[in-house]
Design a protein with these regions (language model features):
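Radical SAM enzyme [4Fe-4S]-AdoMet core and its adjacent flexible, acidic
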Residues: 53-73, 119-122, 182-213
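Canonical Radical SAM [4Fe-4S] cluster-binding loop centered on the CxxxCxxC motif
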Residues: 1-26
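Conserved, mostly hydrophobic/aromatic
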Residues: 8, 28, 45, 78, ...
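N-terminal pre-triad scaffold of radical SAM enzymes
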Residues: 1-9, 33-37, 41-44, 229
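Terminal RNA-binding accessory module
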Residues: 190-254
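Conserved SAM/AdoMet-binding glycine-rich loop
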Residues: 37-157, 168
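Internal alpha/beta loop-helix hairpins
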Residues: 176-181
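Alpha-helix N-cap and loop-to-helix initiation/capping positions
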Residues: 20-27, 58-59, 120-127, 155-159, ...
Length: 254
């Protein structure tokens, strides 16, 4: 699918990609079958808000089931979802199929309700934490990654601490962290309480230290376990090694 209807105050996607447009399940299934015939083992379903997919009453969970049923599809991933559209039905479908990867990208953006409201994210930190707990309940050992913006206009130190606190509660396997930068035509560009670059850098550095600790803790728990790894490319560090990903999206060098 293409486009987005969410209009987060920091995001230019609705202005550049337009409103949400979903393809029929049949057209997606046909394309996946052609990819399988060409030897592709892993399929990624893409969309700016992929789990808000809806076509003639069909849901994203139904699309996942249809793709999962295709013979020869060994792995299915999807990106990027919106937390508002993650639901129990989707999680139960993912848990029920072995070829749907045990991994979800779960963009938090902030752990402060005040900042989430200014971002127009349409969920609260409490809802986000609840759904993260449901993910781990329904899909044990699910890999969780996230996106987080630091230094959003008006963000106080206390609100930044709320984000760190929610990170501690959820413990993501990995995180894509960014200093806020204004985008043309967006509402946030017009906010007057812009944060200095020095403060943004200081907060980002502190956040990265915390995330590295969480990543290390979760990776250590995998030591001694058996994992299926799909080899994807030569390792950047050595032509004698290969790089691939586990079902839960951890990179492994072999």
């Amino acid at each position: 699918m293409r486009g987005c209807n969410k209009f987060c105050s920091f995001c230019i996607v609705p202005f550049t990609r337009g409103r949400e447009r979903s393809r029929s399940i049949e057209s997606v299934v046909d394309e996946v079958k052609k990819a399988v015939d060409q030897g592709f083992a892993e399929i990624t379903l893409l969309g700016q808000n992929v789990n808000s997919y809806k076509y003639e009453g069909n849901t994203f969970a139904e699309l996942l089931l249809a793709v999962s049923d295709i013979k020869g599809v060994k792995r299915i991933r999807y990106t990027s979802p919106h937390p508002q559209d993650i639901n129990v039905e989707l999680l139960e479908v993912m848990a029920s199929r072995k070829n749907i990867c045990n991994y979800i990208h779960f963009p938090m953006q902030s752990g402060s309700n005040e900042i989430l409201k200014r971002m127009n994210r349409t969920y609260t930190r409490e809802h986000f934490h609840y759904m993260a707990s449901k993910i781990r309940e329904i899909m044990p050992n699910c890999g969780l990654s996230t996106d987080i913006i630091v230094g959003f206009p008006g963000e106080t130190d206390e609100q930044f601490r709320e984000t760190l606190d929610l990170m501690e509660k959820v413990k993501f396997n990995s995180a894509y962290t960014f200093k806020y930068s204004p985008r043309p035509y967006t509402k946030a560009e017009q906010f007057t309480e812009q944060i200095s670059e020095d403060v943004k850098k200081e907060r980002l550095d502190e956040m990265l230290v915390l995330q590295r600790r969480h990543t290390l803790e979760l990776n250590k728990k995998m030591v001694g376990t058996y994992q299926q790894v799909l080899i994807e490319k030569e390792s950047k560090k050595s032509s004698n090694h290969w790089a691939g990903r586990t079902d839960s999206n951890e990179w492994v060098i072999i």
